[in-house]
Design a protein with these regions (language model features):
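A short, Lys/Arg-rich alpha-helix, primarily the initiator
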Residues: 1-11
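Hydrophobic micro-packing sites on short alpha-helices
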Residues: 45-49, 59-60
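Short alpha-helical DNA-recognition segment
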Residues: 14-31
Length: 67
């Protein structure tokens, strides 16, 4: 699943470490999410969207939608 996590995080001036702490995950998890190596659980996706005050669809792009 593609995402705009890195773009949104950087636009808000937040480090990977700060985001990881807020989400209660490791910095490595944030990096893996940003690089598309890891798809978040639905709970983590909601936490990310809530943290940035955006919809899940603004962060995560379902590849099936692009077809």
């Amino acid at each position: 699943m593609k995402n705009r996590l890195e773009e949104i995080r950087k636009a808000k001036g937040i480090t990977q470490e700060e985001l990881a702490n807020a989400l209660e995950v490791s910095r490595q998890t944030v990096g893996s999410l940003e690089n598309g190596r890891y798809n978040p659980s639905i709970i983590l996706a909601f936490k990310i969207a809530r943290f940035f005050e955006v919809s899940i669809e603004e962060v995560f792009i379902c590849e099936e939608d692009e077809k």
